[in-house]
């Protein structure tokens, strides 16, 4: 009886999660749009990854940014592994640290071009504060154990130009 009850609870939770995250089913329009997106995915990814590398290099030069984490930067501890597996453009996501959690929120509130959202690999550049979103349900102690810093901003770089993104970041920095 307890096993059946726990299976029902699990099934209910999975249905709830799947419906919330993916919807009940894919409509023909969504299927069509995904087909179109797949055709240009390699071109978009190459542009996004190149922009991400450019942006990471520029962010390292800014005084208000304490550190930049991008596996495509030569100083990154995972640089050799990353470039051997993915080549010179290892992805379109980077993180950087500001002075404090409060500085992160002030920064996010001032963004104009970059959107605040938790998606990945969008055509638009997206920023989140992982400690309060993805890891928001964990205690501070748990986040520290997982090496999740409350001073970190995550960017998933889109198709905008690196110059436009850098301009938005600079104007938003505290």
Give residue spans per PLM region.
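PLP-dependent enzyme catalytic core of the Aspartate aminotransferase-like
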Residues: 102, 127-174
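Active-site C-terminal subdomain of aminotransferase-like
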Residues: 2-93, 97-132
